[in-house]
Design a protein with these regions (language model features):
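Hydrophobic alpha-helical membrane segments
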Residues: 1-312
Length: 312
C-alpha cells in the first residue's frame, strides 16, 4: 500500500468532514462504484422481492385477518421487513464495492477479471462472519419460511422478533463495524497459522481497531438517522417525479417493488462508502499514516536539497 499515491488526501478528518468526503467520493467515482455495487445487490434484491411477494397483497391479507382490517398495517409490515433485510444484507452484498473502494482510493492495479479474487480466497470467513453472524443468511431463511407458511403472512409476531434480532445485530455490528474491510481488503484470517502463532487474526484485528475508533460510534448514530432521512427523501422525490411525468400521485406497486428497494440500496451504497472512509480515518489515527507521509516528504525535500548544486 503506497500512502503517497492515493485518490484522496491521507489526513485525519472530523466526522462532518467524513460525511462530506463520502459524497465527494460518490460524485467522483459514481459509475465505477455503481457497477461494482450492482454485482452484489442485484441477486439480493431479486431474492428479497420474491420472498416478500406474499406480504404485498395488502387487501387480501386485511380481509383474512382477524386482528386488523387496515391494509396500511400490512403495507408497513412489508416496507419494514424489506428495510430489515437490506440492513442485514448490505455488508455482504456491498463487499465488491468495498474492494473497489480500496483499489480506487489507493490506486491499485487490478483487472475486472481478478478483482473478486480476494473475496474467493476469504469465502469461508466471509460466509461465517458477514453471512451467518451478521444475520444476512438467517434473515433470508426466516423470510423464506414465512413466505412458505400462509398463516405467518398475517402474523406480526414474526416481524417483531426479526426487528429485535435486527437491533441486536446492529449493535453488534457497531462494536465491530469494519469486518468487510478487515476480511476483504486486509485478508485477515479467522484463526492463526500454527507455523505463525503471532500472526494477526480477525479477532485481534477487530480488538485493535476498536480501541482506535474514537468517533466511530457517534458517526454510526448519525449515519442511521441520515440513512432513514435519505431513504424517505429519495422515495418522496421519486413519487413526485412520477406524479409530474405520468400523473400518478398514489403510492402504487411500483413504489413497493422498485422505488422503495432502490432507495434502500442507494442509501446502503452511501453508508458503505462512509464506513470505508471511517475505516481509513481509524487507521490513520492508529497507525500514523499522516505522520509517515510527512516524514517521506521531509526526506524527499532533504534529498533534493543535498543533491542540488552548490551556488555559493
Amino acid at each position: 500500500m503506497q500512502l503517497d499515491r492515493t485518490a484522496i488526501v491521507i489526513a485525519l478528518r472530523t466526522p462532518p468532514e467524513l460525511l462530506d468526503l463520502s459524497l465527494v467520493v460518490i460524485r467522483e467515482f459514481a459509475g465505477r462504484l455503481l457497477l461494482f455495487a450492482l454485482v452484489g445487490v442485484i441477486p439480493f434484491a431479486i431474492l428479497n422481492a420474491i420472498l416478500l411477494e406474499p406480504l404485498r397483497h395488502y387487501d387480501q391479507l386485511s380481509l383474512l385477518s382477524a386482528s386488523t382490517t387496515s391494509n396500511q398495517w400490512f403495507r408497513f409490515q412489508y416496507l419494514w421487513w424489506m428495510a430489515l433485510l437490506v440492513m442485514l444484507e448490505a455488508p455482504l452484498a456491498m463487499l465488491g464495492l468495498t474492494l473497489a473502494l480500496g483499489n480506487t482510493v489507493f490506486l491499485s492495479d487490478y483487472s475486472r477479471r481478478n478483482w473478486l479474487n480476494p473475496i474467493w480466497i476469504q469465502r469461508g470467513a466471509i460466509l461465517w462472519i458477514l453471512g451467518i453472524l451478521r444475520g444476512a443468511i438467517p434473515a433470508l431463511l426466516v423470510t423464506a419460511y414465512m413466505a412458505l407458511t400462509p398463516e405467518l403472512h398475517r402474523s406480526f409476531m414474526v416481524i417483531v422478533w426479526l426487528t429485535i434480532a435486527g437491533i441486536i445485530l446492529l449493535l453488534f455490528r457497531g462494536i465491530n463495524p469494519f469486518a468487510p474491510e478487515i476480511l476483504a481488503l486486509e485478508q485477515t484470517k479467522l484463526s492463526s497459522d500454527p507455523n505463525r502463532p503471532n500472526a494477526m487474526t480477525y479477532s485481534k484485528r477487530t480488538q485493535w481497531l476498536r480501541k482506535a475508533q474514537a468517533d466511530a460510534n457517534g458517526i454510526g448514530v448519525t449515519t442511521i438517522l441520515l440513512s432513514a432521512a435519505a431513504t424517505l427523501m429519495l422515495c418522496l422525490c421519486a413519487a413526485f417525479l412520477l406524479g409530474v411525468l405520468i400523473g400518478t400521485w398514489k403510492w402504487g406497486w411500483w413504489m413497493d417493488l422498485i422505488i422503495y428497494p432502490t432507495s434502500l440500496w442507494m442509501t446502503a451504497l452511501w453508508t458503505t462508502v462512509l464506513r470505508f472512509l471511517v475505516y481509513v480515518n481509524t487507521r490513520i489515527r492508529a497507525e500514523g499514516w499522516d505522520l509517515e507521509l510527512k516524514l517521506r516528504a521531509e526526506a524527499q525535500r532533504l534529498s533534493e536539497f543535498q543533491g542540488a548544486p552548490n551556488r555559493g
